[in-house]
Swiss-Prot record:
PANTHER family: TRNA (GUANINE-N(1)-)-METHYLTRANSFERASE (PTHR46417:SF1). Homodimer. The gene is trmD. One of its GO terms (cellular component) is cytosol. One of its GO terms (molecular function) is tRNA (guanine(37)-N1)-methyltransferase activity. Keywords: Cytoplasm, Methyltransferase, S-adenosyl-L-methionine, Transferase, tRNA processing. This is tRNA (guanine-N(1)-)-methyltransferase. It catalyses: guanosine(37) in tRNA + S-adenosyl-L-methionine = N(1)-methylguanosine(37) in tRNA + S-adenosyl-L-homocysteine + H(+). Its EC number is 2.1.1.228. Belongs to the RNA methyltransferase TrmD family. Specifically methylates guanosine-37 in various tRNAs. NCBIfam families: PRK00026.1, trmD. Its main location: cytoplasm.
Length: 250
């Protein structure tokens, strides 16, 4: 049995091959950690043109996705995933997806993601069937497929066994409320730039402190807003103070 089952309702299910066939998410699918199924509302239309959209009442540009094909696709998705599956609509009006929210969603047994198109979907469908709306940022995309894939990728990384190293997810940016530290690989010197000596020292305590200090410093410089909502330990305060002093002296 999969750790997480995700059903996606989309007019472009082929796009989700990027999830099922490549990278970490593909490995999770093959290992049975993630089960991903797509449902196309066009398959639940009854007219010869497979119509899934219509003009908006009140006029205006664009088209709106119709209720009935979405409802029928959702019924099939719920039959597969179970009635308790959380129904999520990817929408600019939704709660912004951050790492804390990703952790919440990773604890669900099943998710049903609705990827809208055109000007959106009929509001009555949202009111009747959607549990939560989520957004990946304050900008406009052509549809909900890319946000759905972002959500799936982020959630999959937190599934036990999905990553090659047990600590990888815990060391990602934002997991501890901080940006990630710099990373280096061979060669030790490239274009006269050396890898920091501490990373070559073999002293794991010093390496841990250096990485934590770099994470704190980067967050302070690039996303200070993250520090406002995070309580720093005594060690973290000291490391950040040292980082700022060293930067100002250089």
């Amino acid at each position: 049995m999969a750790n997480l089952r995700i059903e996606v309702i989309s007019l472009f299910p082929e796009m989700f091959s990027a999830i099922s066939e490549y990278g970490i998410t593909s490995r999770a699918v093959k290992q049975g950690l993630l089960q991903l199924t797509c449902w196309n509302p066009r398959d639940y239309t009854t007219d010869r043109h497979h119509t899934v959209d219509d003009r908006p009442f009140g006029g205006g540009p664009g088209m709106v996705m119709k209720i009935k094909p979405l409802e029928d696709a959702l019924a099939q998705a719920k039959a597969a995933a179970g009635e308790k599956a959380k129904v999520i609509y990817l929408s600019p009006q939704g709660r912004q997806l951050k790492q804390a929210g990703v952790r919440e969603l990773a604890n669900e047994e099943a998710l049903i993601l609705i990827a809208g198109r055109y000007e959106g979907i009929d509001e009555r469908f949202i009111e009747a069937h959607v549990d939560e709306e989520w957004s990946i940022g304050d900008y406009v995309l052509s549809g909900g497929e890319l946000p759905a894939m972002v959500l799936i990728d982020a959630v999959t990384r937190l599934l036990p066994g999905a990553l090659g190293h047990a600590d990888s997810a815990e060391e990602d940016s934002f997991t501890d409320g901080l940006l990630d530290c710099p990373h280096y690989t061979r060669p030790e010197v490239y274009a006269d730039q050396r890898v920091p000596d501490v990373l070559l020292s073999g002293n794991h305590a010093h390496i841990r402190r250096w990485r934590l200090q770099q994470s704190l410093g980067r967050t302070y410089e690039r996303r200070a807003d993250l520090l406002e909502s995070r309580s720093l330990s005594g060690e973290e305060k000291k490391l950040l103070e040292e980082y700022i002093l060293a930067r100002d002296d250089s």
